[in-house]
Amino acid sequence: MLGARLKITVYERQHRSALLDLTCCSRWVHKHLDWHETGQWLDGGMGQVLLAWNDDKLEGYIGLSEPIAGWSWIRLLGIRDGTMPGMVVRELCEAAEFRCAEQGISNIVILMTTNWLPAYFRERGFSHEEDLITMAHIGLQLPPAPTVSARIRRAQEPDVAAMAAIDRLAFDAPWQLADYDMRQAFRTATSATVATLDDEAVAYQLSTRQEEIGHLARLAVHPAHRRKRIASALLHQMLTESKRRNLTELSVNTQLGNWQSQRLYERYGFYRNGYDIELWRKQIR
């Protein structure tokens, strides 16, 4: 039985095992780390993590990303089985929101990846902001390659800083990648290419693979170089490489309101597969 109030503390290294054990053993878990494993994210200090205690028992945790342009993601959330999730979520969120306000963070967002999240976050004042849709491609039949002045080549480690800079210009908050996310995305990508003009990177793509299924994780073009078919060239090259690797299916996520992105993918044979994820937001006063 939970007490009237939980004790909220800041995560420290000594709590690592308890947090990971709760993550593995509970059904009340949300994880949105993209390219990172939970332990890796914790060890890298890539955000702030708060813990909820009932005496010496860990009842829950919440992990928020480092802010970008005043926005922070809820990357981790876990509640111990057998507790009252609503109470734990409420107290963790109250503490997280207070810390965010102190740090000048204006918005907290979360992807509704599991069906138990919406009810509790609605109570906390979060609301549906937009949808992240999934598009799939089967068969890998390609239109002719576009003619572009940009050169497409494999990305190298020295390109990562330029890729991160392009990403921040190409996307609005909260969709921009932090530098550490870009570095990890590059390390784990099956395919990473950049488009250059006069030896300067102006666009990039990152793709991953799991067995015979590929995923276009990121595609971004510097705003000054849009409408030059560079995105089409990067996509065509990625699809050609995927076909060479005998991938049977590809997927990509994009925002429901990003019609330009959707039209590009549709031209190359992608279609919406119905797997949409809601993004919820709370503005911190």
Task: Walk through the language-model features, giving the residues of each.
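Acyl-donor-binding surface of acyltransferase catalytic domains
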Residues: 1, 68-70, 80-148, 278-282
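Short amphipathic alpha-helix that is part of the acyltransferase structural core
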Residues: 1-34, 132, 145-174
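Conserved acetyl-CoA-binding loop-helix of GNAT-fold acetyltransferases
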Residues: 85-98, 221, 227-240, 244, ...
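Conserved hydrophobic beta-strand within the GNAT/NAT acetyltransferase core sheet
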Residues: 108-111, 216, 250-254
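Conserved active-site alpha-helix within GNAT-family acetyltransferase domains
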Residues: 113-130, 228, 232, 256-274
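C-terminal "cap" of GNAT-fold acetyltransferases
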Residues: 133-156, 248, 253-259, 267-285
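Phosphate-binding active sites in nucleotide-utilizing proteins
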Residues: 175, 186-197, 201-210
